[in-house]
Each structure stands twice: as structure tokens, then as C-alpha cells.
Amino acid sequence: MEEKSMFGPENREELTTKGYTVVRDVLSNEECDNCIQQYQRWLQEFPQDVFPPSMHSLISQFNTGHMEPTWFVRLKAKSVFAKLWQTSKLLTSIDAIAIGRPPEDGEESFAEPNKSWLHVDQNASRVGLHAVQGGVYLEEACEDDWTLEVLEGSHCYFEEFFEGRQDAARISELNIFYKLTEDDVKFYGGKGCQKIRVSVPKGGIVLWDSRLVHANARPRKDRKHPGLWRYVVFVSMTPAHWASETDMAKKRYAYNNVVMTSHWSSQGVKTHGSGLSISGLPTKIPEIATTNEAKELAGMVRYDFEDGKSNGPQKPTWKASKNAITFTRANVYTVCFVLCQVLIVIVAYLFNLF
């Protein structure tokens, strides 16, 4: 599925300086609408008045990463990552989607001043650029809609931040994410990193450096387009030659067992199951994901790294972790936070059922 990439020098420059960039026209409006219709049909599989458990619009259960429209978007986004990494020999994440209901309907809350879940997805032992994450927007998102919020330029201070905060570095080694405290946000503010809500056109993709502080932002009251839903497919691809045999085995497991992964697509691959089940849950790979191209991206078919074509940049570096997990007050807080989020999702689901 070869597509012309709109990723250009200006996008590369923005990724380097700002930590994020927006690429237009990854999908046509018609393709976006077709995908939205498929997700809407999937939502109808739930009992009446039940919405799948989500966190800030993210739906990471139910094998959403293996749904047909998700794979369609993933394959369409490949050309962007191929241009970014300067190689077509890539591995993909099998990541979450986001479906955000309009707060105007009373089922979701609006954005609140000075309240967010700003975080980084890269742990302190990774040195430099290890991944570029992406979100393909099937609906337009203006600054006041459901969208991505970033601390612009914060990726430049990633190592400095963790060097001075050993508890934070230890927490990041849990390899989930590190959620910033108010004092952490002030650190980045002191470096001139402004909080920006990113506008993304329909069919576009927003890319961000995994060291960038970011979060999904809720819609603001009195927004320009009240009633607008959010539909986003998250995609991350990195050079295939970065992967170890252990990582490749995990990718094959994810594909063969129809389970999802985190955004780490080559190094440090993490898999997770489908969670709560419903009728319509993907239990087999959709036909669109059985092509040779899709199997290469999933790690099922190996690339030829000796064919004389570019394999992309060299493997990124790691530093030995000095941050063995200990039960400090800070990381106990983070573990409790994650467990609470899981409990909230389960309770919300059971509440909707009954």
C-alpha cells in the first residue's frame, strides 16, 4: 500500500526543535468517514447506554489495535514513518485508539484550568530519540476540541530533568509512563516550554518525540464545534533492525494471539491482552493485515537487511539503570495511581452494565 508521504524538511525541523509536527493528508475525507462508520458500528455492539471504558478518551482494551479500520489507518501511515526514518523496513506498534464523546452531551467532562495528566512515555535509561509516536485524526481537532496537549520543546530537557530527579527516574523505569507533578511542570516552564494545544486537520497525523511532555486534552467549554466527537488511531513505527530476538518473539506473539502492544515497536516491546470482552471483539487478524507488507510491519516476515537499501539510523543507546525500583514514597504513589485508574475503568464498566 504505497502512498506519497507529505512529510517534508519543515516537519523534520519541527520535530527537532519543537518535539512535534503535523503532517496533512495521510487519509482522504472519504477514508476517514469510512473508518469512523466502522468504529460506530463497533460501539453499537455494546449493550444499550454502555460505552467502552476509556481514560481521557483512550480505549486500550477490546483488541482495538487489531480492528480492520485500525490496521487500514496504520498501513496508510507507513509512508510518513518511512520518510521520517529514511527506510521502509519498519516495525509497527499495535496500539490503542481514542474515541471521545462530546462533553456537551453530559457523558464527559470539559477541560479544567491547571488540570491535566501531562506525562512522558520514555523511561530515563533510554538516551536520545528512541521513538516518534503518532495520532491519525479521523475528525478535525481545533485547539479547543479533544486534542493533543504538549509542553513545546520539553524533549530537549528530558535527560536533564531525570538526572536531577532520581525518584522520577526510578518511577519511569516501571516503563509505564511518568506523570508530571506541579513542580515538574514548573521545571519545564522555567526552561521556556509553553503549554500548547495542537490543531490537527481531518486525515492528518500529529507526530511527537517520545521524550516530549504531552497528554490528551479535553474539550473546552464554548468551543467552536460543540458536539464534535474524537476519533484517533495511535501509530508508532521504528526501524526494524533495532529489534532484538526477544522483541521479535513478542511481536509474533502479539500477532498470532491477536493482542495489543504499547507504542514501543522495536525495542522494549510490551504486550497486553484484550481485557473485558464483548461480541464483536477481534479474535483473528483482519484480512487487510494478512498482506506481506502488514506481516513485515508486525514482525512476522523478516526484512533483508543486506539488500543494499537503507535500514535507517543506528540503534539508539541506553545507559545502565542506576534506578532499581525501591519502594520510595514517589513510586508507591505512581503504582497506586495506575491501580486506581484500572479500578476506575472496571467499576465504570460494571456500573454501565447494571
Where are these regions (language model features)?
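Double-stranded beta-helix
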Residues: 131, 141-213
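Short, structured patches in soluble enzyme cores that scaffold and shape functional sites
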Residues: 101, 120-122, 136-140, 150-152
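Non-heme Fe(II)/2-oxoglutarate
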Residues: 166, 202-207, 211-328, 332-335
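Extracellular structured ligand-interaction cores
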Residues: 20, 94, 129-135, 145-147, ...
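Short edge-strand/loop segments of extracellular domains
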Residues: 99-102, 151-159, 232, 236-242
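Short, conserved beta-strand element in jelly-roll/cupin
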Residues: 123-143, 199-202, 236-239
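Terminal signal-anchor or tail-anchor transmembrane helices
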Residues: 329-354
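Non-heme Fe(II)-dependent double-stranded beta-helix
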Residues: 1-18, 24-125
